[in-house]
Amino acid sequence: YFYFEKVKRFGDVPWYDQPLKSDNPDLYKARDSREFVMSKILEDIDYAIAKLPQEQNVYSVTQWTALALKSRICLFEGTFRKYHGIAGHEEYLDECIKAAERFIDESPYLIYKGSSTPYRDLFSSNNAISTEVILARDYEIGLNIIHNANNYTLSNTYGMPGLNKKIVDS
């Protein structure tokens, strides 16, 4: 996922497949091609799909989580290549379809229809609804495992007074 985000943002990036020490000259190597990095990403995700457990666990990465991620990665890369005139988009879109079809056909996930307000239940439940949610985080205030959703709804000053430029310059 780390490299996928880097490719989305920067395109060509250097690929490292082993830990490096701070004095390693490879830290300054040139960027690897997008094609090379994306092939390595798919190689890694295919390895994960083969090795991860199949059991459904909403709070842990499983084979189903990796398949969903592969579908998403391939959809992004395939459409990016198609609409930017880069060759090879068909292969990525085909891989996206294969991963999505396998997920739909073989995974234990279903659309949640457990109440009269299923959409609300997905987002207001204290625990993730394991029949539909693929991966979630279990927040527990007692263990100080919390989210930062308030950062998206509050101002940058978090309710404290903010200083304007005139006050700062005075």
What is the predicted role of each segment?
Residues Y1-W64, R72-E91:
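Aromatic-anchored glycine-rich loop motif in surface-exposed flexible loops
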Residues V13, Y47, S60, W64-L67, ...:
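An aromatic- and glycine-enriched ligand-binding surface/loop that stacks and positions planar moieties
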